[in-house]
C-alpha cells in the first residue's frame, strides 16, 4: 500500500521518479505525485489517478537533481488532488511524502498546530507542519527527529528542505524503506523493485532510524543520535524479472509461471541425494513444540488451511490457523511450547508483523514463510523458509499461493520423515511435485476452455458460489477470493455440507455454482449437493480430478497425489477469475481499492 521513491544525485530526477513509481503500481494506489528540487526551487506535481495521468501533467522541462515521488492509497481523506502526496509545509520550505498511519495526528494538531490552516485531510500534512514549526529553532535534522519522536503509528518518510539542496532526509517505523547505493547518486525506496534500473545494492533502514542522504553517501542514526553502520546487500532480482514481456497482464504471466516455480522449489529444497530436505534446526524446533499456530491474511490464510491439513497428517502435531488481523484481539489459550508460522508473500504485511512482535514478546519461537528474503518478517522471525516464486506483481496472488502450499508440503513431509510417519516415508515428494508441475502445464495450455466457461457463467453474473468438501473447501475459498478481487463479483466459497444450513436460501434461477471435486471419499457427497442446487435453478459447473470425473463435468483436472490436489485444482479457478475479469472489462492487475502489499493495519 503506497510507495515511495527518492533520488539525490547529478541527473534529472524526473524520469527516475516516474519510472520508479510505475514499478510500484502493483502495491495499489489511487493518486500519485512527485516533487523536483532545482537549487532553491521545488516543483510539486500531483493528481488523483494513474502514473500515466501524472506523467502527462509534469512539464517537459521540469528539472531537479533531488526529488521525491509517491503513490497514495487513501487512509485519511478522500483520493483527490489535495490529499495526494507530496505535501508541503505552510511556507513551502519542506516537502514530504509518507507511507503509514499516524494514530495520534489529531492530538498533535490540537496541541501544536491549533492556529494552522491545512490544505488536506491527511495525517501526513500534520508531520510536515510540525517539522517546519520545530525548524524555527532547530536544525532540519533535529526538527525532523523531534517531530518523529511525537508520532504514534507507522511511517516511512522522505523529506526535502528547500534551503538545503544537498540533502535528502528519510525515516521509518513499521513501514518498509531502504537506501539504494549508486555512484554520484543515492536513492530511497519502499521496495527495491522501484529502483532496480538504477542500482542493485541496498541498505535496510530499521525502525525508528533516520537517514541523511547526499549524492556521495548517507548517514544512518537512531532518533537518539547514535550513528549506525550497516552492511549493504545485493538484490537477487533483475529488472527484467518485473516486466510483462509478451503477456497482456502480469496475472496471466504469473499463472503460467507456476510450473516453473514448482520445479524451482523442488531444486531449492533437494539435497545431494535428490531427497526433499529442510534445515535440521527448523525441524528440531518444530518437533520440540506441542502445538503450531499458523498466522496469515487473505490468500496466505487459505494456504495455511491446506498447511494445517498436511502438517497434522504427517507430523502429528495439532495446528491452529489464525487470521492475522483478528489474532491480537483474543490470543488463543497457549500450550506449554507453541510455535508460530507466519505466511506472507511480501514479508511486510502489517497485521502479520504485529502478531509476530506480540508472540516474540511472549517468548515464543517463530518461523516465516515468505517470498522476499530480507523483508521485515524474514528478519524478525527466528527462522525462515523461502518461496522462490520470483516477483509477483499482479495484486491477485497466484504463484505465491501455490508456492506457499508447495513449501508447506516440503515442511510437512520432512517433519513426518523425522518422526517415522509411514505416509511421509512412502511419498517421493520431489517426484510428486514434478507431476504437479506437469499437470499445471497441461491446464495452462487449456485456457480457451476456461475462457469459454467464464463467459458462459460469469460474464454478467452478480454473484457466484464455490463448493468443496475437505481439502477442496479450502480451494473453494481461494477461488471465491480470486473472483471477487478482480471481477468484482460477490463470490463465496462454502463447505458444501453447509448448504442446507442457510446458504441454499440464496440460490435462484441462474445462480452460478461451481463445485471442486478431487477426492474419491467425498465425490458422491458433493455431487448430491450439486444436484440440490441444480433442482433450485442454479447454473452448475463441476471441475473434477481425473479419478472422480464424470460425463458432464466441465473441466477435468489432471491426476496428482491426493495430498497435493490444491496445487492442481486452483489453476482452473485462477484462470476462471482472470477471464471473468476480462469479460467484465475489469483492471486485472490493479483491481479497485486493493493493494498488493498491505503495510498498514
From Swiss-Prot:
<comment type="subunit">
    <text>Homodimer.</text>
</comment>
<dbReference type="Pfam" id="PF13522">
    <property type="entry name" value="GATase_6"/>
</dbReference>
<keyword id="KW-0677">Repeat</keyword>
<keyword id="KW-0315">Glutamine amidotransferase</keyword>
<dbReference type="InterPro" id="IPR047084">
    <property type="entry name" value="GFAT_N"/>
</dbReference>
<feature type="domain" description="SIS 1">
    <location>
        <begin position="282"/>
        <end position="421"/>
    </location>
</feature>
<dbReference type="GO" id="GO:0004360">
    <property type="term" value="F:glutamine-fructose-6-phosphate transaminase (isomerizing) activity"/>
</dbReference>
<feature type="active site" description="For Fru-6P isomerization activity">
    <location>
        <position position="596"/>
    </location>
</feature>
<keyword id="KW-0032">Aminotransferase</keyword>
<dbReference type="GO" id="GO:0006002">
    <property type="term" value="P:fructose 6-phosphate metabolic process"/>
</dbReference>
<feature type="active site" description="Nucleophile; for GATase activity">
    <location>
        <position position="2"/>
    </location>
</feature>
<comment type="function">
    <text>Catalyzes the first step in hexosamine metabolism, converting fructose-6P into glucosamine-6P using glutamine as a nitrogen source.</text>
</comment>
<keyword id="KW-0963">Cytoplasm</keyword>
<dbReference type="GO" id="GO:0006047">
    <property type="term" value="P:UDP-N-acetylglucosamine metabolic process"/>
</dbReference>
<dbReference type="GO" id="GO:0005975">
    <property type="term" value="P:carbohydrate metabolic process"/>
</dbReference>
<dbReference type="InterPro" id="IPR035490">
    <property type="entry name" value="GlmS/FrlB_SIS"/>
</dbReference>
<keyword id="KW-0808">Transferase</keyword>
<feature type="domain" description="SIS 2">
    <location>
        <begin position="453"/>
        <end position="591"/>
    </location>
</feature>
<dbReference type="InterPro" id="IPR046348">
    <property type="entry name" value="SIS_dom_sf"/>
</dbReference>
<feature type="domain" description="Glutamine amidotransferase type-2">
    <location>
        <begin position="2"/>
        <end position="216"/>
    </location>
</feature>
<dbReference type="InterPro" id="IPR017932">
    <property type="entry name" value="GATase_2_dom"/>
</dbReference>
<dbReference type="InterPro" id="IPR029055">
    <property type="entry name" value="Ntn_hydrolases_N"/>
</dbReference>
<dbReference type="GO" id="GO:0006487">
    <property type="term" value="P:protein N-linked glycosylation"/>
</dbReference>
<dbReference type="GO" id="GO:0097367">
    <property type="term" value="F:carbohydrate derivative binding"/>
</dbReference>
<dbReference type="InterPro" id="IPR005855">
    <property type="entry name" value="GFAT"/>
</dbReference>
<dbReference type="InterPro" id="IPR035466">
    <property type="entry name" value="GlmS/AgaS_SIS"/>
</dbReference>
<protein>
    <recommendedName>
        <fullName>Glutamine--fructose-6-phosphate aminotransferase [isomerizing]</fullName>
        <ecNumber>2.6.1.16</ecNumber>
    </recommendedName>
</protein>
<dbReference type="Pfam" id="PF01380">
    <property type="entry name" value="SIS"/>
</dbReference>
<dbReference type="InterPro" id="IPR001347">
    <property type="entry name" value="SIS_dom"/>
</dbReference>
<dbReference type="GO" id="GO:0005829">
    <property type="term" value="C:cytosol"/>
</dbReference>
Amino acid at each position: 500500500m503506497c510507495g515511495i521513491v527518492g533520488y539525490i544525485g547529478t541527473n534529472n530526477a524526473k524520469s527516475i521518479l516516474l519510472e520508479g513509481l510505475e514499478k510500484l503500481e502493483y502495491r495499489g494506489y489511487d493518486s500519485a505525485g512527485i516533487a523536483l528540487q532545482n537549487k532553491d526551487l521545488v516543483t510539486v506535481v500531483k493528481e488523483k489517478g494513474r502514473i500515466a495521468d501524472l506523467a502527462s501533467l509534469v512539464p517537459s522541462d521540469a528539472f531537479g537533481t533531488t526529488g521525491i515521488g509517491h503513490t497514495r492509497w487513501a487512509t485519511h481523506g478522500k483520493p483527490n488532488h489535495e490529499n495526494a502526496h507530496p505535501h508541503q509545509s505552510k511556507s513551502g520550505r519542506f516537502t514530504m511524502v509518507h507511507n503509514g498511519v499516524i494514530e495520534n495526528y489529531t492530538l498533535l494538531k490540537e496541541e501544536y498546530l491549533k492556529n494552522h490552516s491545512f490544505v488536506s485531510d491527511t495525517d501526513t500534512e500534520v508531520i510536515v507542519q510540525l517539522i517546519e514549526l520545530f525548524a524555527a529553532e532547530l536544525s532540519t535534522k533535529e526538527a525532523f527527529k523531534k517531530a518523529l519522536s511525537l508520532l504514534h503509528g507507522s511511517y516511512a518518510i522522505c523529506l526535502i528542505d528547500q534551503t538545503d539542496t544537498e540533502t535528502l532526509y528519510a525515516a521509518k517505523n513499521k513501514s518498509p524503506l531502504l537506501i539504494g547505493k549508486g555512484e554520484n547518486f543515492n536513492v530511497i525506496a519502499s521496495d527495491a523493485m522501484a529502483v532496480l534500473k538504477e542500482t542493485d545494492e541496498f541498505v535496510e533502514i530499521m525502525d525508528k532510524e533516520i537517514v541523511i542522504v547526499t549524492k556521495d553517501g548517507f548517514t544512518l542514526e537512531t532518533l537518539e543520535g547514535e550513528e549506525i553502520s550497516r552492511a549493504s546487500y545485493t538484490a537477487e532480482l533483475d529488472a527484467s524479472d518485473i516486466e510483462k514481456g509478451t503477456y497482456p497482464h502480469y496475472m496471466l504471466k504469473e499463472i503460467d509461471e507456476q510450473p516453473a516455480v514448482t520445479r524451482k522449489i523442488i531444486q531449492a529444497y533437494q539435497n545431494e541425494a535428490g531427497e526433499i530436505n529442510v534445515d535440521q534446526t527448523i525441524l528440531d524446533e518444530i518437533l520440540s513444540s506441542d502445538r503450531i499456530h499458523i498466522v496469515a491474511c487473505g490468500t496466505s490464510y487459505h494456504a495455511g488451511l491446506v498447511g494445517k491439513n498436511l502438517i497434522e497428517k504427517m507430523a502429528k502435531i495439532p495446528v491452529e490457523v489464525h487470521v492475522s488481523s483478528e489474532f491480537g484481539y483474543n490470543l488463543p489459550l497457549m500450550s506449554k511450547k507453541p510455535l508460530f508460522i507466519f505466511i506472507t508473500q511480501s514479508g511486510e504485511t502489517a497485521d502479520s508483523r504485529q502478531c509476530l512482535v506480540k508472540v516474540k514478546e511472549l517468548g515464543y519461537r517463530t518461523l516465516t514463510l515468505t517470498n522476499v528474503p530480507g523483508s521485515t518478517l524474514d528478519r524478525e522471525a527466528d527462522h525462515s523458509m523461502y518461496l522462490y516464486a520470483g516477483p509477483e506483481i499482479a495484486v491477485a496472488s497466484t504463484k505465491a499461493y501455490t508456492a506457499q502450499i508447495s513449501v508447506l508440503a516440503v515442511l510437512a513431509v520432512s517433519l513426518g520423515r523425522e518422526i517415522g510417519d509411514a505416509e511421509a516415508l512412502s511419498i517421493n515428494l520431489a517426484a510428486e511435485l514434478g507431476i504437479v508441475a506437469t499437470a499445471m502445464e497441461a491446464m495452462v495450455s487449456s485456457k480457451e476452455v476456461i475462457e469459454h466457461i467464464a463467459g458462459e457463467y460469469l460474464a454478467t453474473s452478480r454473484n457466484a458460489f464455490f463448493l468443496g468438501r475437505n481439502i477442496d473447501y479450502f480451494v473453494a475459498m481461494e477461488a471465491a477470493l480470486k473472483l471477487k478481487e478482480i471481477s468484482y463479483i460477490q463470490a463465496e466459497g462454502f463447505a458444501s455440507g453447509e448448504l442446507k444450513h442457510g446458504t441454499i436460501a440464496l440460490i435462484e434461477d441462474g445462480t452460478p455454482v461451481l463445485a471442486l471435486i478431487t477426492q474419491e471419499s467425498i465425490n458422491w457427497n458433493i455431487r448430491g449437493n450439486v444436484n440440490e442446487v441444480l433442482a433450485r435453478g442454479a447454473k452448475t459447473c463441476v471441475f473434477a480430478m481425473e479419478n472422480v470425473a464424470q460425463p458432464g463435468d466441465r473441466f477435468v483436472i489432471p491426476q496428482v497425489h491426493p495430498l497435493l490436489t490444491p496445487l492442481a485444482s486452483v489453476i482452473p479457478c485462477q484462470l476462471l477469475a482472470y477471464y471473468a475479469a476480462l469479460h467484465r472489462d475489469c483492471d486485472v492487475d490493479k483491481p479497485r481499492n486493493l493493494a498488493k502489499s498491505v503495510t498498514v493495519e
